[in-house]
Design a protein with these regions (language model features):
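N-terminal Rossmann-like dinucleotide-binding module
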Residues: 1-50, 393
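Predominantly a Rossmann-like dinucleotide-binding segment in NAD(P)-dependent oxidoreductases
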Residues: 10, 127-215, 344
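Short, conserved SAM-binding/catalytic segment
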Residues: 45-53, 110-114
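Short acidic low-complexity segments
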Residues: 54-66
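Beta-strand-loop-alpha-helix segment that lines the small-molecule cofactor/substrate pocket
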Residues: 65, 70, 76-77, 81-128, ...
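Glycine-centered short loops/turns at secondary-structure junctions
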Residues: 91, 118, 143, 230, ...
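Glycine-rich phosphate/pyrophosphate-binding beta-alpha loops
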Residues: 187, 212, 236-244
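C-terminal glycine/acidic-rich active-site capping loop/insertion
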Residues: 227, 254-325, 346-349, 357-398
Length: 398
């Protein structure tokens, strides 16, 4: 295979941006051959925007058409696993938008199909391409900070207005989106958190429903995590603070690292703090760490970087930015946070009981208010296709 024939299932905001990137020749080794959407207005837009690209009104039609070698799945969250599984079973490579689905049970089912398929299965965790996160990952993995003691991430610059939530009936509903800020916006941060600091063994969470907006899911959340080695972590996020903050601090035995305002700052001791604690003959110790500052010399390749790596994985056998199977990790954390909230903020051990979560999520979805008459369908469709490129809010913002 010299060229990957790509189909995009779902051409709303992000799907349209992907389509323009591939159609415009920005991804080497890949050509846009088909798009699919259930909304006729989006297909009309595609007819005008993507000359020669086939259009389908259902995912099943596109998957069975024989026009594609691979697909990008960019549909509402609850359909991610179902459509991705169908594509993999049909012999197509799959790049799934985040999150992998709304629950670890559904993600696990998709992962099993992916392993059996022998096809490339990747997930759109585009913030892993950010050079600051890549550098911090390298520092922690190499042991530069020593054993991690604590991590704190305040990421409250995901501000959204009520107009945003009213732009689609599926948004911010249990039956449509399957969750709030933890599942939609902060999914990227939860992934980076576990990618760098590892998976916690337990979490206790406070997920505030409709704290800042007229919605039925959480728009603010605080997670307290404990790790197998005794380390702790705190994760705070919301879509209701303006201006917000994005500050990620990781503290270890040899110092600490902080990412904030588009730069990484590193404080390193000349020996382990544990050595200082037990060998010093003084009551107090004035630390004089070496201080380093890292400013990235490369740009975040973001979504295009993920799609390019997906193309290369198919054609060259190189790894994608994130294997699809890794998507279950951040879901494990967000699902545990929801369980903690639903069970009176009790501590939840990981891995969670997937069946229990599915039952409780279904109960929430059954009482969902997803049929809100907050925006006219025609207006929503027009909003979905009013731009052609990637929006800055989809990348790391400081």
């Amino acid at each position: 295979m010299d060229i990957v024939r790509l189909g995009i299932i779902g051409i709303g905001n992000i799907g349209t941006a992907h389509a323009h990137a591939v159609y415009g020749g920005e991804i080497s080794g890949m050509k846009l051959k088909a798009v699919c959407d259930v909304n006729p207005k989006r297909l009309e837009y595609a007819k005008a925007a993507f000359d020669g690209v086939k259009r389908f009104s259902s995912a099943d039609e596109l998957i069975k058409s024989g026009t594609c070698d691979a697909v990008i799945v960019s549909v509402p969250h609850r359909l991610h696993s179902q459509i991705s599984q169908a594509a993999l079973k049909a012999g197509l490579h799959v790049l799934c938008e985040k999150p992998e689905d709304v629950s670890v049970g559904r993600a696990d089912a998709l992962n099993r199909v992916a392993r059996e398929s022998g096809k490339v299965f990747a997930i759109m965790l585009n913030q892993r391409t950010n050079p600051l996160f890549k550098k911090l990952k390298q520092l922690v993995s190499s042991g530069k900070l020593g054993r991690i003691k604590n991590s704190v991430w305040i990421v409250t610059n995901w501000y959204r207005t009520q107009h945003y939530y009213d732009s689609g009936d599926w948004r911010a509903t249990w039956s449509g989106e399957g969750g709030g800020v933890l599942l939609n916006q902060a999914v990227h941060n939860l992934d980076i958190w576990q990618w760098i600091c590892g998976m916690p063994s337990s979490v206790t969470a406070f997920c505030d429903r409709a704290r800042y907006h007229n919605i039925e899911v959480e728009d603010a959340a605080t997670i307290f995590a404990r790790y197998p080695d005794g380390a702790t972590g705190t994760f705070i996020t919301s879509t209701g603070e303006c201006p917000g903050t994005n500050r990620f601090e990781v503290s270890g035995e040899y110092g600490k690292a902080v990412i904030e305002d588009g730069r990484l700052k590193l404080w390193l001791l000349d020996c382990s703090e544990r050595k200082i604690c037990f060998e010093s003959e003084r009551d107090f110790y004035e630390a004089k760490p070496s201080v380093y500052e890292y400013l990235p010399d490369e740009k975040e390749s973001a979504h295009k970087g993920v799609i390019q790596a997906f193309s290369d994985a198919i054609l060259k056998g190189t790894p994608p930015v994130a294997w699809g199977e890794e998507g279950i990790n951040e879901l494990m954390i967000s699902n545990a946070a929801y369980l903690s909230q639903w069970k009176n903020n009790t501590t939840v051990n990981l891995p969670i009981d997937a069946d229990e979560f599915e039952r409780m999520l279904d109960k929430m979805a059954q009482s969902s208010e997803s049929a809100r008459e907050s925006a006219k369908p025609a207006e929503k469709a027009e909003k979905q296709i009013s731009h052609v490129g990637y929006q800055s809010r989809w990348s790391v913002n400081w």
